[in-house]
Every structure is written in C-alpha cells, then in structure tokens.
Amino acid sequence: MSWTIDIPNEALPDLPPLPDGIEEKFRDVVDRPAKQQPSWDQAQADNVRKILESVPPIVVPPEIQSLKRKLAAVATGRAFLLQGGDCAETFESNNEPHIRGNIKTLLQMAVVLTYGASTPVVKLARIAGQYAKPRSADRDGNGLLNYRGDIVNGVEPTEEARRHDPARMVRAYANSSAAMNLVRSLTSSGTADLYSLHEWNREFVSNSRAGARYEALANEIEAGLNFMSACGVNDDTLRSADIYCSHEALLKDYERGMLRLGQDDRGHTKLYDLSAHQVWVGERTRGLEDFHVNFVALIGNPVGIKLGPGITPEEAVEYAEKLDPLREPGHLTMIARMGHDKVRTVLPPVIKAVEESGHKVVWQSDPMHGNTFTASNGYKTRHFDKILDEVQGFFCLLYTSL
C-alpha cells in the first residue's frame, strides 16, 4: 500500500532509561558500527525512530515465546521448520491477493510435509517486515543510489526516488502491521482449513504438468482425511494454523525503534524486537563485534544467522556461544546458504563443531542465495537444478551428521 506519511516537525521526547543491566547492554550494542546502512540524515532518522518507539507492536512476546517452544521441538528432531515468502517485500505488492497467495502456498506445502514426514511443521513466513535489502555497491551502473528496499528508497531510476528517506520506516511499519493483521485473520477464518488446503493441492495435481508425480500422495492424504471424518474428528486445529513472521534485522534505526520490554516464560524482563517473531542476521552483516550480531544477542526473540561458504567451524561455534549463551534448544537457527557446489564440503565440519559444543540449534537450508548468478540480460537468477542439489546435499548431511 503506497501510503504517504506526515512526520511531525517537533521531535518526540526520549524514552525513560531501561532497567539496570539492560540499559548498559543496550548502549553498548547501539554504539557499535553497522554495515549496509542508508546514507540519510541521522537527525531526521532519530525523529522517525522515536515515532516507532511509541507505536503499537506488530507482534507480542507471548507469540514469540510460542514460536520459541516450537523451534525447540525442531532443534531436537520433533518438528520440521518451513520458511517462505518474498525475497524483498514492496509497498505496492502488500495487498490481500498477494498476501493470501503466499500464505496459501506456505500452508499447502506444510500439509504435504506434515503428512510425508509424519511430523509437525512450524510455519515461518518471510513477511510483514522484509523491506530492506543489502547491496554490494552504494551506486548502480547509472550512478544512482542503489535500491535498498522500500523501507529506504524507491526502485524507480531517478535521483528523487533513490534518495534515502527515513520517513519510509513509518510506511514500512504501517504496511507490516496491516500484513500481519491479515495473516492472523486468514489463518483463523478458513484459509488454513485442512480440507480446503487438500482441495487446493488436488487442483494442483489435476492442472499442473508436474502434478502426476504427486497424485499417489494426494490420494493417500485424501484417504487419511476421509478416515478422520468417518471417525468424527472435527477439532479446531483442523481449521486454523499458526504462522509466524520473520525478516532480516538489517536496518539499525528501524529495529531499534521496535524494541520493547516484555517478560519471558519464566517471568524475566527482556528486550524484544516486536517487529517480528524471529529475525536473522545476513551473510554480509555478521561481523562478530558489529551491531547486527550483538543486537540479536541482546533480544529475547529466537534468532537466525546466515552462514555462507566462507564460514569456519571455529567461527560457527563463536556465533553459537554469543547468540545462544544459555544453550536453549531452538533459540538459534543456523542458516546454510553455501551454494550447491560447497554445501557438501563446508557444512559437515561446521555441524560437527557446533553439535560438540553443546548447542542444540535449528539447522536450516537457504538454497536460493548461494546459487545466484547474473544472466545475460542483467537480471539475477538461479538454476532450479542447482537449488534442488543444495537441498538434497543439505538433508543428506543432516541425516549422517546428527
């Protein structure tokens, strides 16, 4: 939704200090250098950040704690994690048909995975906040500032559109809030109904050229549903689902503005990033002493970190020690994005070192970003067979390593 936002001319007052112990850690984190940040006026950005500090959160701590419990099941082999969504959301595409389509696809995939693996599937959408993009250069081939996502600037190739505008953070917040509200409505009002999802999968089998290979599986699922219906199974869990939201915690001013105090399951006061249920640190911003890694170490959310082909076992253990100091199963997700030609050689010693260190992390495959190349027309793309090869390599390694 392409809303315009009027930013108050007068700055809002600062928030009161955080409780002792948390304030010192917070100050240490925000004073650290952050890579991949916009070149906007910091005084204006500070004013916008103070607006974000006063708005209602997008998610709440009890939802975050619910996700943490489910990720603990994933880390201990009792559940499967499925994450999907847009590489980068846009304000223009943040509408009901697009969001419904993404959620419907995620739920359809979850049904097949749940049946095939006989395992609960934790559904994590890349939605309601994935508005920032890291870039390899500040400017494009035409000398314009590179597009860094709708939260920073516009994609149109003009000087004005590419200007870094901190007011866009409020637009990103408004769009994220609207998206998360719709996700909650969809998953509790029929879209997540198990019988409807199966019918949509049936339509895929009937209408897709690739559908024939899945017909036997669809028949098995249908037989299972018919059996439950005959037994009178009609629980609310068959008609609703929990979908959690996630994004890369890239933009320092935005993530800082969405921090709130809350309590965990044990009644301990913590800082939470209430822009999402889970946030992760990208491959380009994972400096151990920099802002991003130390920010996610500060918060009570479950967190992730992308590990590219340059990662070493020693580095991976350092990340585990910093981001999972209490050794909570599932608190940390390590996301392998190594490329199909590297995953089988780089990942095994990393898994071995982390497991031997006593951390029970979620191991996740991102087969998209390590297999990117630039086509002759200038567009970045991937070969599907290489994506599939990395996924297959990843799962073979997990079965032999864990």
Where are these regions (language model features)?
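Intrinsically disordered, low-structural-confidence terminal and linker regions
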Residues: M1-R49
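C-terminal accessory/interaction regions of large nucleic acid-associated machines
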Residues: I51-I58, A72-A73, L81, P97, ...
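N-terminal signal-anchor module of multipass membrane proteins
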Residues: V60-P62, G84-G85
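N-terminal amphipathic alpha-helix/helix-capping segment at the start of soluble metabolic enzymes
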Residues: I64-G77
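Short coil-to-beta-strand
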Residues: G77-R78, W363-S365
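Short loop/turn segments at strand-loop or loop-helix junctions that form parts
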Residues: L82-C87, L124-I127, S365-M368
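Active-site-facing alpha/beta catalytic cores
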Residues: A88-E89, S93-G339, Y379-R382, E390, ...
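Non-transmembrane, aqueous-exposed alpha-helical and coiled segments at domain scale
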Residues: H331-I335, H340-W363, H369-L402
